[in-house]
Amino acid sequence: MQELIKRAKELLADGTVVRVLGWKAGDLAFNPEPAYFETPESLEDFVYDGFCGANLSKYMIEASKLEGKTMVCLKPCDTYSFNQLLKEHRVDREKAYIVGVGCKGKLDIEKIRKMGIKGIRGISGAEITGDAETLTVDTVYGEKTCAYKDAMLERCHVCKGKEHKIYDELIGESKETKDADRFAEVERIEAMSPEEKFAFWQSELSKCIRCNACRNVCPACSC
């Protein structure tokens, strides 16, 4: 992460970019949030770890409307999204300085909680650098551990690959995480009878409260 911060400061200092789009620390160790950084000093709040799962490509839609170039940190999967937005002329390639960042799979705090780990105060082992395969979770009840792989987001288990499809420079190494078939769930649904499919979608759509979270999380949202 320090290499990423150092490079961001250099690009701001020499005028290559006027802002950096990355992640800042949240209230808790496991909820970093997307943020703009416009000064080298503000980058003290910059973070990049296993919980930075948010895709920053869609934020470039608005950033493309601003004056000057934006340095944006994109994981390998995020670059697919950026390319799609580029094809739809929704982002301006000339307004983006893309730094491809390494990824070894992103983490899901809900999976950790479902393991019975409660009262979480902090988590170590989520750093991007290093080959830690175990997370150490500091809780109000003492330290707990779990396998990094067991806490990964479902989408990381069906990762399309760790190759960045578009970038200006690369920082950090990636680690393959795919260990499942991307279309297994699709095939399961396709194998259902019409009655089973109807019941399945009825159950899924019954959860909808029109919060627009599905729209916000969609990597392109061009429906």
Predicted regions and their residues:
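Short, intrinsically disordered, charge-balanced linker/junction segments flanking boundaries
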Residues: 221-223
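Residues immediately within or flanking Cys/His clusters that coordinate Zn2+
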Residues: 153-156, 205-211, 215
